[in-house]
Amino acid sequence: MLITVLNVALGGAIGASCRYLIGVGVLRALGPTGFPVGVLGVNILGSALMGAFVVLAAHKGLTHLSPFVMTGVLGGFTTFSAFSLEAVTLFERGAYGQAALYIGLSAGLSIAALALGMMAARGVLT
């Protein structure tokens, strides 16, 4: 159990660090946009990776890596709490249209990306 917890912690540190670096990179590339582009992109990418890993792990017998990859790396990488904060911040600024768009895109595209990740992984395996 302790080894699993340490694997989750290590994965979380890796995922969170990647999320931070992507956020900084997006900010440097686009400047302050007033729209949470970095968090949106991370959540979509993370969902696609989660979908792909679920399928690959099941077919390749890698489910033992799930705590490290899914709970740790991808759990630290994607961020529902940051999503919630960004949505409320947009609402508080009075940017109701942007808030609704952000919520819709985050949910819709992340779910679609997860499904695409699963389909891509299945395509690789067959």
From Swiss-Prot:
A single BP term in Gene Ontology: cellular detoxification of fluoride
Family annotation (InterPro entries): FluC (IPR003691)
UniProt activity-regulation remark: Na(+) is not transported, but it plays an essential structural role and its presence is essential for fluoride channel function.
Location, primary (coarse class): membrane
Membrane topology: Multi-pass membrane protein
This protein's UniProt keywords: Cell inner membrane, Cell membrane, Ion channel, Ion transport, Membrane, Metal-binding, Sodium, Transmembrane, Transmembrane helix, Transport
GO cellular component: plasma membrane
Catalyses which reaction(s): fluoride(in) = fluoride(out)
Residue spans crossing the bilayer: 2-22, 37-57, 65-85, 99-119
GO molecular function, one term: fluoride channel activity
Subcellular location: Cell inner membrane
Positions with a binding annotation for Na(+): G75, T78
Family per record: Belongs to the fluoride channel Fluc/FEX (TC 1.A.43) family.
Function according to Swiss-Prot or TrEMBL: Fluoride-specific ion channel. Important for reducing fluoride concentration in the cell, thus reducing its toxicity.
Name the record gives this protein: Fluoride-specific ion channel FluC
Species: Ruegeria sp. (strain TM1040) (Silicibacter sp.)
Species lineage: Bacteria, Pseudomonadati, Pseudomonadota, Alphaproteobacteria, Rhodobacterales
Gene behind this protein: fluC
